[in-house]
């Protein structure tokens, strides 16, 4: 199916995938390309709009990322954000300098409401700033359309050439008018209509996989989580019983999860499911390991080795399915962005693995994955399962992993999830879980001194996992969860609640 396309040019900002997410919320498909993509390649893609992302560099830095100036002569609307805004100004003859006062965080912005970019935005508002340099003087032919107290060019436009730049991050939720501004760029300036939907995505992906695989055999890394479940269903609809799902029970799952996954997928989906119990193998490899990156690498390595062994038992296997999604990719780092932490679906893959990968969801954000799942008829209870990392409880037990610690966090997590569901908060909170932060503290229980583990509770609200706020769970629910865990889980005498947003923290502790 032919779609209108917006290209997002990656200059290394951590919000790059979020920009793509916001464009898709406008009902338009977009792709992210590296900054050194040639003009010829850009022309071949025939984009209807181009967005330059932010990035950590200065336009005056050595080997700073840039683009060919010809991109501004294609007749395609361009929107620069933060560094992308500064780069546009620099390349077109404006003046970029070190700001006398840096702007970080929420900032009051005055906008020119006569600009097409700010059409329908009735009042000035708060925008999210994060910059050291700023545009001191806009290029010739550009008009200043927004300012702050310390930033003389918070936004600029060349309406005739349809070139626009904003110093603030329109893509983050903190910018009050950000989504409306992006809608104006996509619909009013680029002239695009809604053409991107999860129903059409699912149909196209099923067709694509059917053509790619043909009669070959496929092995699916099934965990029972939302991502792997939807990935498995797409491939199952494409090739039927030529898909074999391997469910690795590595001993790092949540309470009763292994039995639930096996029962649901065999009964409701009629898939070829093989459950492999290798808890001792994984725990043996992880014994004495405390570093979180090492844990992830070990788990990624063992996952692939288990699949290789099981594939030999199944017969000829040509492809491996993984539930990799967009945030997995951005958090594992790109050519221009710093690695935050290696994701198990990306950084943990051995270089000598013997399969070709099929990653049907790598273009999607979590809410899009859920929407595809609904389109495919996956039961609501599975589509809305809590996100669960591939390394499982290994990264929710900080420090060295033992069976005792796993049992503690498993039971505490089950209580937390049960009470959140009882309070009907399970679909309004993006993600919630318990973790064991490797902290012991003094307490008093039954008139006796204790020196026991601390459990940390984490709950966040988000729409895409790129940014999140800590969830404001009612105190009475937190109180109930705390009392239950302390009374019902042996070895715990203290409960803490994590009230850190992302950024600066990540959602998981490791």
UniProtKB/Swiss-Prot annotation:
Origin species: Clostridium beijerinckii (strain ATCC 51743 / NCIMB 8052) (Clostridium acetobutylicum)
EC supergroup of this enzyme: ligase
GO cellular component terms, A-Z: cytosol
HAMAP family: GMP_synthase
Subunit description: Homodimer.
Gene: guaA
Keywords associated with the record: ATP-binding, Glutamine amidotransferase, GMP biosynthesis, Ligase, Nucleotide-binding, Purine biosynthesis
Protein name in the entry: GMP synthase [glutamine-hydrolyzing]
Function, in words: Catalyzes the synthesis of GMP from XMP.
UniProt-listed CDD domains: GATase1_GMP_Synthase, GMP_synthase_C
NCBIfam families: guaA_Cterm, guaA_Nterm, PRK00074.1
Boundaries of every Glutamine amidotransferase type-1 domain copy: 5-195
InterPro entries for this protein: Class_I_gatase-like, GATASE, GMP_synth_C, GMP_synth_GATase, GMP_synthase, GMPS_ATP_PPase_dom, Rossmann-like_a/b/a_fold
tRNA-binding recorded as keyword: no
EC number from the UniProt entry: 6.3.5.2
GMPS ATP-PPase domain: residues covered: 196-385
Classification via PANTHER family: GMP SYNTHASE [GLUTAMINE-HYDROLYZING] (PTHR11922:SF2), GMP SYNTHASE-RELATED (PTHR11922)
Residues annotated as catalytic: 82 (nucleophile), 169, 171
Catalytic reaction annotation: XMP + L-glutamine + ATP + H2O = GMP + L-glutamate + AMP + diphosphate + 2 H(+)
Residues annotated for ATP binding in this entry: 223-229
């Amino acid at each position: 199916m032919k779609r209108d396309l917006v290209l997002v040019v990656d200059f290394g900002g951590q919000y790059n995938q979020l920009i793509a997410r916001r464009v898709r919320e406008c009902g338009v498909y977009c792709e992210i390309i590296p900054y050194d993509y040639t003009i010829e390649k850009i022309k071949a893609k025939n984009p209807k709009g181009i967005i330059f992302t932010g990035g950590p560099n200065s336009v005056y830095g050595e080997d700073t990322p840039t683009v060919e100036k010809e991109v501004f002569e294609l007749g395609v609307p361009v929107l620069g954000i933060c560094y992308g805004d500064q780069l546009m100004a620099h390349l077109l003859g404006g003046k970029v300098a070190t700001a006398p006062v840096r702007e970080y965080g929420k900032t009051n912005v005055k906008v020119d409401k006569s600009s097409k970019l700010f059409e329908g935005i009735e009042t000035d508002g708060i925008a999210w700033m994060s910059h050291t340099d700023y545009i001191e003087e806009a290029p010739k032919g550009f008009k200043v359309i927004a300012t702050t107290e310390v930033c003389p060019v918070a936004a600029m436009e060349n309406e005739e050439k349809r070139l626009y730049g904003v110093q603030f991050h329109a893509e983050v939720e903190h910018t009050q008018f950000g989504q409306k501004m992006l809608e104006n760029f996509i619909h009013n300036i680029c002239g695009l209509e809604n053409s991107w939907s999860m129903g059409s995505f699912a149909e196209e992906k099923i067709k694509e996989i059917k053509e790619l695989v043909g009669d070959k055999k496929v092995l699916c890394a099934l965990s029972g989580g939302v991502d792997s479940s939807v990935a498995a269903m797409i491939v199952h609809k494409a090739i039927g019983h030529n898909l074999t799902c391997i469910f690795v029970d590595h001993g790092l799952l949540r309470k009763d999860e292994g039995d639930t996954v096996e029962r649901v997928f065999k009964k409701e989906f009629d898939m070829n499911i093989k459950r492999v119990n290798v808890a001792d193998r994984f725990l043996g490899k992880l014994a004495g390991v405390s570093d979180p990156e090492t844990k992830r690498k070990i788990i990624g390595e063992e996952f692939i080795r288990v699949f290789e062994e099981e594939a030999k038992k199944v017969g000829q296997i040509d492809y491996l399915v993984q539930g990799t999604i967009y945030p997995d990719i951005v958090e594992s780092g790109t050519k221009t962005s710093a690695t935050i932490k290696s994701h198990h679906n990306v950084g943990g893959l051995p270089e000598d693995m013997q399969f070709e990968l099929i990653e049907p969801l790598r273009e999607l954000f979590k809410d899009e994955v859920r929407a595809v799942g609904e389109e495919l008829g996956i039961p609501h209870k599975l589509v809305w399962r809590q996100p669960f990392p591939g390394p499982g409880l290994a990264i929710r037990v900080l420090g060295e992993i033992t069976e005792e610690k796993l049992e503690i966090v498993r039971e505490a997590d089950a209580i937390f999830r049960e009470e959140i569901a009882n309070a009907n908060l399970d679909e309004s909170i993006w993600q919630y879980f318990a973790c064991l932060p490797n902290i012991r503290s003094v307490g008093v229980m039954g008139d006796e001194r204790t020196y026991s583990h601390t459990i940390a509770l984490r709950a966040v609200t988000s729409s895409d996992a790129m940014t999140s706020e800590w969830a404001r769970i009612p105190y009475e629910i937190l109180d109930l969860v705390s009392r239950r865990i302390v009374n019902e889980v042996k070895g715990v005498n203290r409960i803490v609640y994590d009230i850190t947003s992302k950024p600066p923290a990540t959602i998981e502790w490791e």
